[in-house]
Protein backbone atom coordinates (compact mmCIF):
# COMPACT_ATOMS: atom_id res chain seq x y z
CA UNK A 1 0.00 0.00 0.00
CA UNK A 2 0.81 3.68 0.05
CA UNK A 3 2.12 3.54 3.63
CA UNK A 4 4.95 1.20 2.59
CA UNK A 5 5.95 3.59 -0.20
CA UNK A 6 6.41 6.35 2.38
CA UNK A 7 8.88 4.25 4.38
CA UNK A 8 12.25 5.34 3.04
CA UNK A 9 14.59 3.46 5.41
CA UNK A 10 14.47 0.09 7.18
CA UNK A 11 11.97 -1.24 4.62
CA UNK A 12 12.57 -4.88 5.53
CA UNK A 13 11.89 -4.32 9.23
CA UNK A 14 8.87 -2.08 8.71
CA UNK A 15 6.77 -3.66 5.99
CA UNK A 16 3.02 -3.38 6.61
CA UNK A 17 0.94 -5.93 4.71
CA UNK A 18 -2.44 -4.82 6.07
CA UNK A 19 -3.86 -2.99 9.07
CA UNK A 20 -3.90 -5.46 11.97
CA UNK A 21 -4.84 -4.87 15.60
CA UNK A 22 -5.69 -6.86 18.72
CA UNK A 23 -2.98 -8.01 18.29
CA UNK A 24 -0.88 -6.01 15.83
CA UNK A 25 1.15 -8.38 13.65
CA UNK A 26 4.01 -6.11 12.57
CA UNK A 27 5.99 -3.17 13.97
CA UNK A 28 4.11 -0.49 12.00
CA UNK A 29 0.75 -1.73 13.26
CA UNK A 30 2.12 -1.97 16.81
CA UNK A 31 3.27 1.67 16.74
CA UNK A 32 0.01 2.89 15.14
CA UNK A 33 -2.13 0.94 17.62
CA UNK A 34 -0.19 2.41 20.53
CA UNK A 35 -0.65 5.97 19.24
CA UNK A 36 -4.33 5.44 18.42
CA UNK A 37 -4.89 4.22 21.99
CA UNK A 38 -3.28 7.41 23.32
CA UNK A 39 -5.41 9.51 20.96
CA UNK A 40 -8.56 7.66 22.02
CA UNK A 41 -7.89 8.60 25.63
CA UNK A 42 -7.38 12.26 24.67
CA UNK A 43 -10.59 12.37 22.62
CA UNK A 44 -12.60 10.54 25.29
CA UNK A 45 -11.52 13.07 27.90
CA UNK A 46 -12.23 15.99 25.56
CA UNK A 47 -15.70 14.72 24.61
CA UNK A 48 -16.68 14.17 28.21
CA UNK A 49 -15.38 17.64 29.16
CA UNK A 50 -17.89 19.23 26.74
CA UNK A 51 -20.75 17.04 27.96
CA UNK A 52 -20.82 14.39 25.24
CA UNK A 53 -20.91 10.64 25.84
CA UNK A 54 -17.90 9.16 24.07
CA UNK A 55 -19.52 5.72 23.78
CA UNK A 56 -22.18 6.73 21.23
CA UNK A 57 -20.69 7.35 17.80
CA UNK A 58 -22.03 8.18 14.37
CA UNK A 59 -19.81 5.87 12.29
CA UNK A 60 -18.39 3.37 14.75
CA UNK A 61 -21.04 1.06 16.17
CA UNK A 62 -21.79 0.86 19.87
CA UNK A 63 -19.63 -1.88 21.38
CA UNK A 64 -18.89 -2.66 24.98
CA UNK A 65 -15.68 -1.02 26.13
CA UNK A 66 -15.23 1.14 23.03
CA UNK A 67 -15.45 4.92 22.89
CA UNK A 68 -17.17 4.96 19.50
CA UNK A 69 -17.47 8.75 19.26
CA UNK A 70 -13.78 9.09 20.11
CA UNK A 71 -13.03 6.66 17.28
CA UNK A 72 -15.18 8.77 14.94
CA UNK A 73 -13.23 11.94 15.70
CA UNK A 74 -9.86 10.20 15.51
CA UNK A 75 -10.60 9.44 11.85
CA UNK A 76 -9.99 13.14 11.13
CA UNK A 77 -6.56 13.09 12.73
CA UNK A 78 -5.13 9.68 11.89
CA UNK A 79 -2.68 11.49 9.64
CA UNK A 80 -0.99 12.94 12.74
CA UNK A 81 -0.30 9.48 14.17
CA UNK A 82 0.78 8.14 10.78
CA UNK A 83 3.19 11.02 10.30
CA UNK A 84 4.73 10.48 13.74
CA UNK A 85 5.29 6.78 13.02
CA UNK A 86 6.69 7.41 9.54
CA UNK A 87 9.05 10.09 10.86
CA UNK A 88 10.29 7.84 13.67
CA UNK A 89 10.97 5.04 11.16
CA UNK A 90 12.51 7.20 8.43
CA UNK A 91 14.81 9.02 10.85
CA UNK A 92 15.80 5.60 12.26
CA UNK A 93 14.73 6.65 15.74
CA UNK A 94 12.42 3.64 15.93
CA UNK A 95 14.18 0.38 15.04
CA UNK A 96 13.47 -3.33 15.16
CA UNK A 97 15.03 -3.41 18.65
CA UNK A 98 12.10 -1.35 19.96
CA UNK A 99 9.63 -4.21 19.51
CA UNK A 100 8.81 -7.55 21.11
CA UNK A 101 8.01 -10.33 18.66
CA UNK A 102 5.88 -12.93 20.42
CA UNK A 103 5.48 -16.60 19.52
CA UNK A 104 1.78 -16.03 18.82
CA UNK A 105 2.73 -13.62 16.02
CA UNK A 106 1.81 -10.51 17.99
CA UNK A 107 4.21 -7.58 17.83
CA UNK A 108 4.32 -5.04 20.67
CA UNK A 109 6.39 -1.97 21.46
CA UNK A 110 8.86 -2.57 24.28
CA UNK A 111 9.59 0.05 26.96
CA UNK A 112 12.18 1.85 24.81
CA UNK A 113 9.82 1.91 21.83
CA UNK A 114 6.95 3.26 23.91
CA UNK A 115 9.22 5.98 25.29
CA UNK A 116 10.28 7.03 21.77
CA UNK A 117 6.69 7.18 20.53
CA UNK A 118 5.49 9.03 23.65
CA UNK A 119 8.32 11.56 23.32
CA UNK A 120 7.43 12.21 19.66
CA UNK A 121 3.72 12.48 20.58
CA UNK A 122 4.45 15.00 23.34
CA UNK A 123 6.58 17.08 20.97
CA UNK A 124 3.86 17.02 18.33
CA UNK A 125 1.21 18.06 20.86
CA UNK A 126 3.25 21.19 21.67
CA UNK A 127 3.55 22.21 18.01
CA UNK A 128 1.44 25.20 16.95
CA UNK A 129 -1.07 24.98 14.11
CA UNK A 130 -3.75 27.25 12.73
CA UNK A 131 -7.14 25.59 13.17
CA UNK A 132 -8.84 25.72 9.74
CA UNK A 133 -12.33 26.52 11.08
CA UNK A 134 -11.52 28.62 14.14
CA UNK A 135 -8.73 30.41 12.25
CA UNK A 136 -6.78 30.59 15.50
CA UNK A 137 -3.35 29.30 16.42
CA UNK A 138 -3.59 26.42 18.88
CA UNK A 139 -1.29 23.69 20.14
CA UNK A 140 -1.91 20.45 18.27
CA UNK A 141 -2.56 18.81 21.65
CA UNK A 142 -5.71 20.95 22.00
CA UNK A 143 -7.19 19.64 18.75
CA UNK A 144 -9.28 16.92 20.49
CA UNK A 145 -10.85 19.61 22.70
CA UNK A 146 -11.42 22.02 19.81
CA UNK A 147 -13.12 19.37 17.66
CA UNK A 148 -15.15 18.03 20.60
CA UNK A 149 -16.38 21.54 21.44
CA UNK A 150 -17.35 22.12 17.80
CA UNK A 151 -19.22 18.81 17.70
CA UNK A 152 -21.07 19.72 20.90
CA UNK A 153 -22.03 23.10 19.39
CA UNK A 154 -23.33 21.35 16.27
CA UNK A 155 -25.37 18.82 18.25
CA UNK A 156 -26.85 21.63 20.36
CA UNK A 157 -27.78 23.62 17.24
CA UNK A 158 -25.33 26.46 17.89
CA UNK A 159 -23.65 26.01 14.49
CA UNK A 160 -25.25 24.76 11.26
CA UNK A 161 -22.76 22.05 10.39
CA UNK A 162 -19.88 20.26 12.02
CA UNK A 163 -16.58 21.51 10.58
CA UNK A 164 -14.56 18.37 9.95
CA UNK A 165 -10.86 18.85 10.62
CA UNK A 166 -8.77 18.60 7.47
CA UNK A 167 -4.98 18.74 7.66
CA UNK A 168 -3.38 20.85 4.95
Model-found features: residue ranges?
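Active-site helix-to-loop segments that bind/position phosphate- or nucleotide-bearing substrates
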Residues: 1-168
Amino acid sequence: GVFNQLILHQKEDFRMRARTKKPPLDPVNAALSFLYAIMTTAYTSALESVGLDSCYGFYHALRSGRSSLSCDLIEETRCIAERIVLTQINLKILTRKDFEFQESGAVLLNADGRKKILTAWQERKRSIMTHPYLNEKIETGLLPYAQSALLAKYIRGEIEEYPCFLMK
